[in-house]
């Protein structure tokens, strides 16, 4: 029932990784008998979870990661890289840049800026923070949008307002235009797959409104982002996903339909110049090369390099 063959592959990969380090022998003091007791207790306690890993469970996002993602994450934990700076994880930082570039390409972004996060909540907060620095004004989102947007606006002290949804649960573009006429909207958050109904906001209509009123568009695709790859969407929905190349920022959660271990979110920006907003200096934070250290473009400091490896 639980896939276990990958454990053998992990042992082999560990030996290969160890062979790459030319270090003097170092013995670790580990009480394996006690460790076995603890793991047995953990195994029993973990039985008090719903078995979402079984195919009988459908229609929810708490799926186990892909076997290779899970095993790669475990392998990385023997190093435990920190992708804040290259010194903490040179190769895992390189992998993160590759992953982010792949996701940006999936949405049609050319030049881009982005990084992985602990999840969609942190990624959305960062996107809203950048939006507030670039374009002053309140942030609006559909009344079907995830509650995190209103909450993060409260944290960031940014005015927030809900836009009425239509009968299908999508943002009502006519109601949005009434708000835009006031001239005090800085950013419109669209949802690509609402949590309750899985609906996609009318990006085509919202882009037309942007040409008229000038505002930022942030796409919350934490849940629905990977449907960009789906081949069975209706043409109108498919068009909305293709139009994502025109938004200012996108959030996607690889730990949902990307089959990655929790927590792994990602924030992407269409304009790399927003990197200047992250500039900071302190006597205990410095970077040892001209190559980009991901901590230079992230609100989070320590971040698990294992997420990028997976």
Residue spans for each PLM region:
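N-terminal entrance/gating region of PLP-dependent enzymes' catalytic architecture
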Residues: 1-110
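Active-site nucleophile and cofactor-binding loops and adjacent substrate-binding regions
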Residues: 88-92, 114-121, 141-143, 191
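Conserved beta-loop-alpha segment that forms the PLP phosphate-binding cup at the N-terminus of a helix
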Residues: 93-101, 112-136, 148-152
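Short acidic, glycine/serine/threonine-rich loops at helix termini
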Residues: 126-129, 150-155, 198-202, 227-233, ...
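PLP-dependent aminotransferase-like
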Residues: 135-183
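Active-site phosphate-binding strand-loop segment of PLP-dependent enzymes
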Residues: 171-219
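Active-site pre-lysine segment of PLP-dependent enzymes
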Residues: 174-175, 200-212, 224-249
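Active-site C-terminal subdomain of aminotransferase-like
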Residues: 236-310
